[in-house]
């Protein structure tokens, strides 16, 4: 009987540890100040990306909100066969920035950031800065999120 209870305790404890490691979206997704207050590392990543790519944090965060709703594990919904059988995803986009695999590979090659991870906010913020800076060089203003998008 004690062994049985110990198994459940270990399983429950492991589940709690895994859940605590998951990154949750911000509690107040409509307020960038509250997001940065809650997630200081996101603020630091946004400022770092701004210094490197000259893209303001509000533009960067608007991309993240639009693409993933601040979810690290965001992916496109699976297509359905016969309306209910899950099938393939329509694209390879993953993470905060919803970067496609090919575009992400281009970013890693151009920046030398070969260990970048699409589910890491810091890397996604840098990617968005890189991507938006491409739009700037095509004639769009760095502060115009709609045009850069």
Feature roles, as predicted:
Residues 2-9:
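Bacterial N-terminal signal peptides that target proteins for export
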Residues 22-149:
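Catalytic glycan-binding domains that act on GlcNAc-containing polysaccharides
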């Amino acid at each position: 009987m004690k062994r049985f209870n110990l198994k459940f305790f270990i399983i429950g404890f492991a589940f709690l540890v895994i859940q605590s490691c998951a990154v949750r979206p911000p509690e107040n997704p409509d307020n960038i100040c509250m997001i940065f207050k809650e997630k200081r590392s996101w603020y630091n990543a946004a400022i770092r990306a701004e210094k490197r790519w000259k893209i303001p944090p509000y533009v960067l965060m608007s991309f993240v909100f639009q693409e993933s709703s601040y979810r690290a594990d965001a992916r496109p919904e699976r297509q359905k066969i016969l309306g209910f059988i899950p099938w393939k995803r329509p694209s390879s986009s993953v993470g905060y920035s919803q970067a496609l695999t090919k575009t992400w590979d281009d970013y890693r090659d151009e920046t030398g950031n070969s260990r970048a991870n699409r589910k890491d906010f810091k890397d996604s913020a840098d990617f968005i800065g890189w991507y938006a800076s491409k739009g700037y060089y095509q004639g769009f203003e760095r502060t115009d999120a709609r045009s850069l998008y």
